[in-house]
Amino acid sequence: MQEIKITEQEAGQRFDKLLCKYLNKAPKSFLYKMLRKKNITLNGKKASGNEKLAKGDCVKLFLSDETIQKFSEAFSGYTNVSLDILYEDEDIILINKPVGMLSQKAARSDESLVEHLISYLIQSHALTEEDLRTFRPSICNRLDRNTSGIVAAGKSMAGLQSLSQMFHDRTIGKYYLCLTAGIIEKPSQVEGWLFKDERTNKVEILFQERPGSARIITEYRPIKSHDGVTLLEVHLITGKTHQIRAHLASVGHPLIGDHKYGASQINREYEQKYHLQSQLLHAARLQFPVCTQTLCNVSKKEFTAPLPKQFYRIAAEKGVL
């Protein structure tokens, strides 16, 4: 038998979510069967799994040590990647993600920002391997592999939940910088619907709603135009897959370097001259609203991430910085 006392770190999550982390190799069907048979209890009583855990709750697993060991897998994704940390407190962390790094794993063998973050937190003694059995830090805003910039993550359950809720409610201002083809002279807000083809991982911008499509709103303002390009600041109102890339391409201003939605001839020119392999899109700024309790330290604050060197060099040479 093993006993888990719920601490402030684990409090606030569903009981079955905690069990999935603690016995991370066990099928969900096994966990629910153990709950039904009272082999796993909450505060000495039978539980369904959908209970919200509170600090001080007592979880008991009436399972053999061999069974627990069989269904538990320790964190093994240690990395030594140095993170560009923009802000950190006890509950949240903001990281400037480089181009080429996954935000989250796409396959089991992948290394992503999440693994680098967990390694950093363990090495800095902000987290222990035992902590990882009941709580895993996670990111709240995912960027494409080849999009750089600010990624926000929760270090504690309270931080993760509060931050995730703010992104869900769209109360955090998300501002991107991108280099687009063509001259844009005036600020604009464009709207439409986005339809994602899961098979090709590509999206289509529609001007009429279609079953399965999502409403999108993108605001942008030109910072400077010169030599056939515009440095644009984009305010992402909604945040859907490839929204900025596809939406700007649909109005005739594809991102420089975007091989999925961009102009192939323009991309070839930049690849030959600058060895550019990906879109020039950077999550440059986060604006927090008035925050209380867990996020009070970032209330009404703004955080910025510097442009990657290649983006800065190209923008400077094109005369838009």
Stretches found by the model and what they are:
Residues 1-321:
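RNA pseudouridine synthases
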